[in-house]
């Protein structure tokens, strides 16, 4: 099972926010997830990013691959260098 750390879109039309989740790479974007490790709200100024650092490091050490966007967010928070 290939596990990815990716964004799950939530919120209303034209008012999105995203949950940072761990999911099977074959599941749909807003489908079943394994774990939720944070959220990202791009509409606030500055953007609101909250990540559970311990959970993120645990999943990364277990082999979960972050998407390109999530990798940028994790760098901003300081989870990865």
Curated annotation (Swiss-Prot):
In terms of domain of life, where is this protein from? Bacteria
The answer to keyword Ribonucleoprotein applying to this record is yes
Q: Which cysteines are joined by disulfide bonds?
A: none
Its GO biological process annotations read: translation
Write the record's keywords in alphabetical order, separated by commas: Ribonucleoprotein, Ribosomal protein
* Record-linked InterPro entries: Ribosomal_bS16, Ribosomal_bS16_CS, Ribosomal_bS16_dom_sf
Q: Name one GO molecular function term.
A: structural constituent of ribosome
Q: What is one GO cellular-component annotation here?
A: cytoplasm
Matching NCBIfam families, A to Z? S16
Query: Which PANTHER family does the protein's record reference?
Result: 30S RIBOSOMAL PROTEIN S16, SMALL RIBOSOMAL SUBUNIT PROTEIN BS16M
HAMAP family annotated for this entry? Ribosomal_bS16 (MF_00385)
The family this protein is said to belong to: Belongs to the bacterial ribosomal protein bS16 family.
Q: What is this protein called?
A: Small ribosomal subunit protein bS16
């Amino acid at each position: 099972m290939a596990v990815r750390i990716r964004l799950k879109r939530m919120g209303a039309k034209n008012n999105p926010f995203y949950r940072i989740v761990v999911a099977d790479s074959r599941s749909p974007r807003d489908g079943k997830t394994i774990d939720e490790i944070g959220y990202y709200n791009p509409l606030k100024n500055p953007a609101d990013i909250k990540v559970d650092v311990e959970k993120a490091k645990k999943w990364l050490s277990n082999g979960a691959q972050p998407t390109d966007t999530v990798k940028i967010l994790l760098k901003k928070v300081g989870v990865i260098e």
